[in-house]
């Protein structure tokens, strides 16, 4: 028994050691999309998540054909966003500055999603938020940035004078938002410990 294998196959001790050391795949964070769930279960995107069946896959495929200032294809293996990764990314962006207090627009979110996808390999279906009006909480547990409406008087003040840019998100008067609210990214450390989105909208997490 096993004689033919022992004669023909080499390298088993090395493979056995790799198997012994292999760590289980990290669980995707609560709130990620269907494609990330696919990556969590199978380690790759399956036929159930293609450009024809998944809006995030279709969007990503379209971005790969455009010039966005940096290569879109990831430098590392594709994987789902995890709680720890979302938390680490939140701390990094808070420490480096630039996102906290920035006026939100879909284009800006796209740029951030593509940068994270390219440098870290996290599939861009993790940065989703609860619906408005009011504060929008992140669906992905561990992502510590929420979207907060800007007070109307601050919008008016920012738009005074002739120097304001009509294409700036502040001047768009919430055109990206169904509620027509101008939103700003705000860091909130409580989001690391309390999953507000799940408490407010448990229906989003039935398949998690």
From Swiss-Prot:
Its job: Factor of infectivity and pathogenicity, required for optimal virus replication. Alters numerous pathways of T-lymphocyte function and down-regulates immunity surface molecules in order to evade host defense and increase viral infectivity. Alters the functionality of other immunity cells, like dendritic cells, monocytes/macrophages and NK cells.
Gene that produces this protein: nef
Domain remark text: The N-terminal domain is composed of the N-myristoyl glycine and of a cluster of positively charged amino acids. It is required for inner plasma membrane targeting of Nef and virion incorporation, and thereby for infectivity. This domain is also involved in binding to TP53.
Region (Mediates dimerization, Nef-PTE1 interaction): 110-126
Natural source organism: Human immunodeficiency virus type 1 group M subtype B (isolate MN) (HIV-1)
Membrane topology label: Lipid-anchor
Official protein name in the record: Protein Nef
Motif (Dileucine internalization motif): 166-167
Modification type Phosphoserine: residues: 6
Chain spans, region SH3-binding: 71-80
Annotated site location: Cleavage: 59-60
Any one Gene Ontology BP term: symbiont-mediated suppression of host antigen processing and presentation of peptide antigen via MHC class II
Keywords: AIDS, Apoptosis, Early protein, Host cell membrane, Host Golgi apparatus, Host membrane, Host-virus interaction, Inhibition of host adaptive immune response by virus, Inhibition of host autophagy by virus, Inhibition of host MHC class I molecule presentation by virus, Inhibition of host MHC class II molecule presentation by virus, Lipoprotein, Membrane, Myristate, Phosphoprotein, Secreted, SH3-binding, Viral immunoevasion, Virion, Virulence
Motif (Diacidic): 176-177
Lipid attachment, kind N-myristoyl glycine: 2
């Amino acid at each position: 028994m096993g004689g033919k294998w022992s004669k023909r196959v080499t390298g088993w001790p090395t493979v056995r050691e790799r198997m012994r050391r292999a760590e289980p795949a990290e669980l995707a964070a609560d709130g990620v999309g269907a494609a990330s769930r696919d990556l969590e279960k199978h380690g790759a995107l399956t036929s159930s998540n293609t450009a024809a069946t998944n809006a995030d896959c279709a969007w990503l495929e379209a971005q790969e054909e455009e010039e966005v200032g940096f290569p879109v294809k990831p430098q590392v293996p594709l994987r789902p966003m995890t709680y720890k990764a979302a938390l680490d990314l939140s701390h990094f962006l808070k420490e480096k500055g630039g996102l906290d207090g920035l006026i939100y627009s879909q284009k800006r979110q796209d740029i951030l999603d593509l940068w994270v996808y390219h440098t870290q390999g996290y599939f861009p279906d993790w940065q989703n938020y609860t619906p408005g009006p009011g504060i929008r909480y992140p669906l992905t547990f561990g992502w510590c940035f929420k979207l907060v409406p800007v007070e109307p008087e601050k919008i008016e003040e920012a738009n005074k004078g002739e120097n304001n840019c009509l294409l700036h998100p502040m001047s768009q008067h919430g055109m990206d938002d169904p509620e027509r609210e101008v939103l700003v990214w705000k860091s909130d450390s409580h989001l690391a410990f309390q999953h507000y989105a799940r408490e407010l909208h448990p229906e989003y997490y039935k398949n998690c």
